[in-house]
C-alpha cells in the first residue's frame, strides 16, 4: 500500500498567469524593465539581428564579471541585466532544451531580492518574493531558496519546491527534503534526498551519524511514496548528450565517516537494480552506457541502459573510461609504461594506449597507442574516423591529446620543464600542422569552435607586455585572427561562433572577425571599478 508522507512547501510563490498557465496570481510587467535593467529596445546595438540566426537562448556574461549580463535569442536582446541582477540560463537536464531563464533582482532600498522566471520570448512566467536557484528536468521546475543552500548545516530542511512548468501546479514535497532529482522524461517520478534531524538536536553538525540519517524517497506526482532507502543518497548520471533517462546512481553510506559502502544503478520506471561486483562504484562511460566497478580490485561490468532494460556489454579487469560501439578504453594496462588499454569488443584484441581523450561536443574518442598511432572513433556509431601514424617530437618529454569534432585531434608536446616545444594537428589524412622548429612557440592551444572547414583553435603566447591575448588558427596553423582578448567558447553556441574581446568591444564573433553580437565594455554598470573580464 502506498503511503503519503508529504506536504506542500511552507512558502507560497506568486505565480504569473502566462497564457492560462496559472490560475491565482497577479500579472507582471514586461520581462526586461527592472530597476537598473535595460529593456531590449533600449540596449545599445552594434550589430545586425540577422547575423546570429540560430533562434536559441544564449547568456553573455557581463564584462565586469559580477552580476549583470545579457540574454540573447539568436541575435535579439531579450534582457540586459543591471550589475545587481544575477541570471541563470535553464537547460532541461533530460531533453537538452533551453527555453527559460531565471533572474534574481535586488529590491531598491533594501537587502531583499526577488526572482523572476522568463520564457524564450522574454515573457515573465513566474515570480518569487525571494532569491531562488533553479533546475529544469523533464518539464519540472525544481527550486531551492538561496537562503536555504546551507540550511542542512543547522538541520533546516523543506526549502525545496517543485512545479509542473506546463500547468503551474506545485507538486508535493517531503518536509525533510534536501533536494529533488528527476530522471524520467515525463517527470512522473520525483527523487528526494532527505535528512531526519534526530530528536533533541538543533543542528545537523551535532549529529554524529549524519550519513546514516539520510535517506532517499521516490514518489509519484501525488506524493505517494514508491520507494525508501535509508542511509542512502541519490545522484544522476550524465554524458555529453545529457542525463540518463530513467536511471539513478544510488550510494549507501558505510557509517558516520561519510564513506560509501557500495553503489548501484536503479531504474525508477521498471525497478531494475544493478549492483555489479561487491563494493562497486558507478561511472558514466558514454551515451546511456555506464560502468559498475569493484572498489577492491578494479574489475568492472559495462551496461547499455538505453533500452527498457539493462544489457550487459562485457566484463573487464579494469574500470571502463570510454565506450563507443565496438570498443572500450580501460583505465589500466599490463604495460607499466602505458596507463590505458583499448579493447576491440568483436575480436577481443588489446592495444596499449599512452593517451586517451573524449570530445564532449561530439562524443568522439581519441587514443594515442604505445607505438604512436592515432585512432579516433565516432562517439555515436563507433566508426574509425582516423587511423594515422603520429610524428613524435624529439624534444618532447610529455604529450597531451585533445579529441576534436569530425575526426580531428590536437597534440601538444612539452619539455621536461613543461615548456611547450610543439603543437600538432591531425585529421584522417595525417599530420596537418606542426609548430616544431618555429622561432616563437605558443604556450598552449585549445579547441575554440567548429566550422564547415573543420575545427578552429585559440592559441596563446606570452607577450612581452604581459598581455593575455590569443590568436585564432585553423587546423593547418593558418592565422585567422590575432591578438584577441577573452577568446574562448561556451556550451551551445552555434558553429563558427565564440566569445571575444577586441579593443573596447566584447561579445560573439565569427572566424572572419565579424561581430555577431557585441557590446561596449563601458556599457556595464560596474566598469567604473576598472578591470573585469568576460567568462
Enumerate the predicted regions with their spans:
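Short, conserved catalytic or interaction motifs in soluble domains
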Residues: 27
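Residue-level detector of conserved, function-critical positions
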Residues: 33-535
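Bacterial N-terminal signal peptides that target proteins for export
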Residues: 2-13
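C-terminal motif of bacterial Sec signal peptides marking the signal peptidase cleavage site
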Residues: 23-24
Amino acid at each position: 500500500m502506498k503511503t503519503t508522507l508529504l506536504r506542500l512547501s511552507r512558502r507560497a510563490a506568486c505565480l504569473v498567469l502566462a497564457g492560462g498557465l496559472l490560475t491565482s496570481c497577479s500579472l507582471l510587467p514586461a520581462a526586461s524593465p527592472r530597476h537598473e535593467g535595460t529593456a531590449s529596445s533600449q540596449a545599445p546595438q552594434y550589430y545586425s539581428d540577422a547575423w546570429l540566426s540560430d533562434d536559441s537562448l544564449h547568456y553573455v556574461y557581463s564584462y565586469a564579471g559580477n552580476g549583470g549580463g545579457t540574454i540573447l535569442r539568436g541575435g535579439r536582446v531579450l534582457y540586459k541585466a543591471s550589475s545587481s541582477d544575477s541570471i541563470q540560463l535553464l537547460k532541461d537536464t533530460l531533453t537538452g532544451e533551453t527555453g527559460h531563464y531565471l533572474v534574481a533582482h535586488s529590491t531598491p532600498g533594501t537587502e531583499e531580492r526577488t526572482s523572476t522566471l522568463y520564457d524564450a520570448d522574454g515573457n515573465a512566467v513566474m515570480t518569487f518574493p525571494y532569491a531562488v536557484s533553479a533546475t529544469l528536468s523533464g518539464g519540472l521546475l525544481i527550486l531551492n531558496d538561496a537562503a536555504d543552500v546551507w540550511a542542512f548545516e543547522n538541520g533546516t530542511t523543506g526549502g525545496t519546491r517543485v512545479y509542473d512548468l506546463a500547468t503551474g501546479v506545485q507538486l508535493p514535497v517531503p518536509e525533510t527534503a534536501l533536494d529533488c532529482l528527476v530522471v524520467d522524461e515525463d517527470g512522473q517520478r520525483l527523487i528526494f534526498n532527505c535528512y531526519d534531524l534526530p530528536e533533541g538536536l538543533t543542528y545537523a553538525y551535532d549529529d554524529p551519524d549524519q550519513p546514516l540519517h539520510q535517506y532517499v524517497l521516490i514518489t509519484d506526482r501525488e506524493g505517494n511514496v514508491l520507494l525508501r532507502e535509508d542511509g542512502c543518497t541519490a545522484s544522476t548520471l550524465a554524458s555529453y548528450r545529457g542525463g540518463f533517462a530513467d536511471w539513478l546512481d544510488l550510494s549507501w553510506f558505510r557509517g558516520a565517516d561519510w564513506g560509501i559502502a557500495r553503489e548501484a544503478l536503479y531504474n525508477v520506471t521498471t525497478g531494475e537494480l544493478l549492483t555489479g561486483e561487491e563494493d562497486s562504484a558507478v561511472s558514466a562511460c558514454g551515451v546511456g552506457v555506464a560502468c559498475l566497478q569493484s572498489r577492491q580490485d578494479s574489475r568492472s561490468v559495462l551496461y547499455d541502459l538505453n533500452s527498457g532494460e539493462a544489457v550487459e556489454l562485457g566484463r573487464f579487469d579494469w574500470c571502463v573510461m570510454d565506450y563507443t560501439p565496438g570498443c572500450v578504453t580501460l583505465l589500466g594496462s599490463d604495460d607499466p609504461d602505458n596507463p590505458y588499454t583499448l579493447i576491440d569488443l568483436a575480436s577481443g584484441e588489446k592495444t596499449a594506449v599512452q593517451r586517451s581523450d573524449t570530445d564532449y561536443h561530439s562524443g568522439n574518442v581519441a587514443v594515442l597507442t604505445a607505438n604512436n598511432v592515432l585512432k579516433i572513433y565516432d562517439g555515436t556509431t563507433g566508426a574509425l574516423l582516423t587511423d594515422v601514424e603520429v610524428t613524435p617530437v624529439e624534444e618532447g618529454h610529455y604529450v597531451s591529446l585533445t579529441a576534436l569534432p569530425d575526426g580531428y585531434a590536437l597534440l601538444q608536446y612539452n619539455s621536461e620543464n613543461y615548456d611547450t616545444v610543439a603543437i600538432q594537428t591531425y585529421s584522417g589524412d595525417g599530420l596537418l600542422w606542426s609548430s616544431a622548429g618555429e622561432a616563437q612557440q605558443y604556450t598552449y592551444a585549445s579547441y575554440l569552435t567548429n566550422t564547415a572547414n573543420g575545427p578552429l583553435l585559440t592559441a596563446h603566447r606570452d607577450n612581452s607586455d604581459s598581455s593575455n591575448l590569443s590568436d585564432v588558427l585553423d587546423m593547418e596553423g593558418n592565422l585567422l585572427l590575432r591578438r584577441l582578448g577573452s577568446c574562448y567558447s561556451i556550451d551551445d553556441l552555434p558553429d563558427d561562433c565564440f566569445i571575444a574581446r577586441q579593443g573596447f568591444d566584447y561579445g560573439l564573433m565569427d572566424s572572419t572577425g565579424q561581430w555577431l553580437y557585441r557590446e561596449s565594455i563601458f556599457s556595464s554598470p560596474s566598469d567604473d571599478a576598472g578591470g573585469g573580464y568576460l567568462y
